A protein has these predicted regions:
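ABC-family P-loop ATPase nucleotide-binding domain
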Residues: 1-26, 232-247
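ABC family nucleotide-binding domain
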Residues: 16-225, 230
Length: 247
């Protein structure tokens, strides 16, 4: 092989937003060790929408927290955009979470005394290159709910405000932990449509973790987790629109 040629695997790693290699996570519970992750190898690529699918206890939330800089692996390496998160200082991790990652959780965590617009502004005021709060809310189809308080919004609308809050700082990556877990299927589909719109229109690399296998059909790739390991990776050659999903 000529010295100028590149190994295809190395090229793939170079194009990855995240490169995860040999990641293990062990929690010490008294005298008992709990292995949440066991030797995870994974690349995530710019602009793709990935669903991480697994039952409760499969390790998917732990993996998402490590990708988001909320937790660190016991062993292994996590690289983001070429930088090593596993060697980052707490100050560097804080900057990473603040400027590069948007989080969406199962529960919305909106500030009850602030309107939808004001909940978004809390984030944009501390961001480097934020969207206008109105623009973020319009992107999730809530342009007519700008001045409503959380108590005046349905569960699905509150979750869409949470998505708007996450994307308003213009993150490179959107990490979603069971974003439809507290919603009925009809409302959940509206939330998934908002996530799809963000992924397609902004090009935000998006990872959604869920136990709901139906959601996997809208993803570019599906990462199956079981017992702390990646058991299977599927590529959807033909993706379904969220409106075509049912559960």
């Amino acid at each position: 092989m000529p010295t100028s040629a590149k190994n295809p695997d190395n090229v793939k790693h170079e194009n990855a937003v995240f490169h995860v290699h040999g990641v293990t996570k062990i929690y010490q519970m008294g005298e008992v060790q709990v292995r949440a992750l066991r030797g995870i190898d994974l690349d995530l690529y710019k602009g793709e929408l990935v669903v991480m699918l697994g039952a409760s206890g499969s390790g998917k939330s732990t993996l998402l927290n490590i990708l988001g800089g909320l937790d660190s692996p016991t062993e292994g390496r996590v690289q983001y955009a070429g930088g090593d998160l596993t060697r980052a200082s707490e100050k560097e991790l804080t900057a990473y979470r603040r400027y590069h990652v948007g989080f969406v959780f199962q529960f919305y965590n909106l500030i009850p005394s602030l309107t939808a617009l004001e909940n978004i502004a809390v984030v944009t005021e501390i961001s480097k290159t934020p969207m206008q709060p109105e623009e973020a809310l319009k992107l999730v189809d809530l342009g007519d709910r700008l001045h409503h308080f959380p108590a005046q919004l349905s569960g699905g609308e509150q979750q869409r405000v949470a998505i708007a809050r996450a994307i308003a700082k213009n993150p490179d990556v959107l990490l979603c932990d069971e974003p439809t877990g507290a919603l009925d299927s009809k409302t959940g589909i509206v939330v998934l449509e908002a996530l799809q719109r963000v992924n397609q229109e902004l090009g935000t690399t998006t990872a959604v973790i869920t136990h709901n296998a139906s959601i996997a059909q809208m993803a570019d790739r599906v990462i199956h987790l079981a017992d702390g390991r990646i058991s299977q990776v599927d590529v959807n050659e033909t993706k379904l629109d969220p409106s075509q999903l049912s559960w």
